[in-house]
């Protein structure tokens, strides 16, 4: 390849791990720099790569859902991280959830043992030299020093929002005389644990949330007031209205305990149906650990234990991890990046992952795949690629890197993190009224176009994909 100086990837999260793997798979040496354990972030719990600090779910599996389509596109593109997620999945109804510890441990071992990847455990205080091909994948928890240098480089204030993580409890501490196993509307296996609340229990729970003590905001987080709407703390939902939680993560619809009687008895349903339901999702293969779905929180740890133990079935809950809230950083990508994920003012510097303003694990992996692929192409003096806007990955990365025709000029003035969604895709050439059928048509078009991209990349194996 003629590339003697290793490429740099800064940050070994989901995006950085994927980027480093794609570069190495192209036969190009790469140095992956990770600041842990030299410096800890407020949210990480281990030194492993690709640690999942919030949920253990990559989102819906079905390819007629936005997150599922993005995952399927990544499988076609031979994503290392998504392949690992598939291999370490745990039951989660229609979602791709993983055993987070085994998932991250496997990625760490595979990357650390790759002959073309050198791992450096160190904090980077400034951006690489201008002649160094680099991928910036430091994530939403970018260190203060590097964030400051990035601000100087871009000439823009970085953007912030608060994100939060949910508690995890031991499965053995769940009281199944009150809780029950089921998936909503009985779709698939009974993969969730459900804790039903009646109206009095729900109102008591909400009242305690509203009066609970909050954890103190750290000095470096002061002045950041905005919360990310896709990951709101449960206490914030409680503040927004009496019914907000039970129309959100605590919604009871489609959940029935067979011990209550015949589901098809309408009169029985009226009297027995839960007023609200707290759901828990499996964390590990053996079902020893469970996370509370939608229970991101910034309550003090003692308050978390006290209030969660008010939930029927969790009165003796034993906690493995408690919820935390932390600041997330992202750049104003529409002003800074090309759809190739190259910085416009320095084309050999690329960005990937949540720091670019994509939201969700699978989207971070997608950014890592494209940034790593393009870094390898640049090293080979080849033209970087973009992905078709008809694909979920292409549409999402185009959205964050330029003003979309669907989003007028205010997009640049108020840029906020964006998850994958069908609203980003260009219209079909025919009108389809039924939403599920319409999403299916989007899926078919996207998968056809992403396969063409993969076939193009495999011509002459310029990136070595066939050897993965």
From Swiss-Prot:
GO terms for biological process: tRNA methylation; tRNA wobble uridine modification. Keywords: Cytoplasm, FAD, Flavoprotein, Methyltransferase, NAD, NADP, Transferase, tRNA processing. It holds the Pfam family GIDA. Its cofactor is FAD. It catalyses: uridine(54) in tRNA + (6R)-5,10-methylene-5,6,7,8-tetrahydrofolate + NADH + H(+) = 5-methyluridine(54) in tRNA + (6S)-5,6,7,8-tetrahydrofolate + NAD(+); uridine(54) in tRNA + (6R)-5,10-methylene-5,6,7,8-tetrahydrofolate + NADPH + H(+) = 5-methyluridine(54) in tRNA + (6S)-5,6,7,8-tetrahydrofolate + NADP(+). It is an enzyme of class 2 (transferase). Its EC number is 2.1.1.74. The keyword Methyltransferase applies. FAD binds at residues 11-16. The keyword Flavoprotein applies. Gene3D superfamilies: FAD/NAD(P)-binding domain. One of its GO terms (molecular function) is tRNA (uracil(54)-C5)-methyltransferase activity, 5,10-methylenetetrahydrofolate-dependent. Belongs to the MnmG family. TrmFO subfamily. Catalyzes the folate-dependent formation of 5-methyl-uridine at position 54 (M-5-U54) in all tRNAs. NCBIfam families: gid_trmFO, PRK05335.1. This is Methylenetetrahydrofolate--tRNA-(uracil-5-)-methyltransferase TrmFO. It comes from Prochlorococcus marinus (strain SARG / CCMP1375 / SS120). The gene is trmFO.
